[in-house]
Amino acid sequence: MLVTLEGLDGSGKTTVWERLRSDDAVPSETVFTREPTDTWYGDAVQRSIDNDDADSLAELFLYTADHAAHLSETVRPALNEGRLVVSDRYSDSRYAYQGATLAGSGTFDDPLSYVREVHAPWTRPPDRTVYLDLDPETAARRSGATNKFETAEYLTTVRDNYERLIEADPERFVRVDATADPDTVYERVRAAILD
């Protein structure tokens, strides 16, 4: 089973992911992973994040290459072994974030749909996605707005994209209010994964 943690920067995904890694109730053979990865593909993605002038289409394909390698090297092998995979960010992040970035380019009528179409023939959709829901202003404040992906204006478009994804596949998504206290958020995410 592939479970993904999604949400705006500052929503608490990584904090929850770290807590799950040390939770004795989570099966010991669980594979914990994340995107961008720690590979050279992920390093290229990180360089693009840090570059305010990165071309949005080129950036999409860096993320896509990282995702393809992640699937072939980590996700699919673990799933083939029958293991639970929990990923801190996955394809929905790319759809939401790169869809928002491409929206600013004026090149695409529906950037979110374009990004999904690029992935449709080969990606492995999650079985369940836990979406940590947070308003863009709080997300920008929590994340420190240190790069181009963390401003409230940009995160508003990202959140709108996540809402479109949830509307298109409501059975897969579990929405968790990320404004709740951290222990409550964790327990809700944990229940969504283990129940």
Curated annotation (Swiss-Prot):
Catalytically driven reaction(s): dTMP + ATP = dTDP + ADP
Family listed: Belongs to the thymidylate kinase family.
Pfam families in UniProt: Thymidylate_kin (PF02223)
GO (cellular component) term, any one: cytoplasm
Gene3D superfamilies in UniProt: P-loop containing nucleotide triphosphate hydrolases
Single GO BP term: dUDP biosynthetic process
Name recorded for this polypeptide: Probable thymidylate kinase
Keywords: ATP-binding, Kinase, Nucleotide biosynthesis, Nucleotide-binding, Transferase
Top-level EC class as recorded in UniProt: transferase
EC number: 2.7.4.9
Top-level taxon of the source organism: Archaea
SUPFAM superfamilies recorded: P-loop containing nucleoside triphosphate hydrolases
GO molecular function per UniProt: ATP binding; dTMP kinase activity
Binding-site residues for ATP, renumbered to this chain: G7, L8, D9, G10, S11, G12, K13, T14
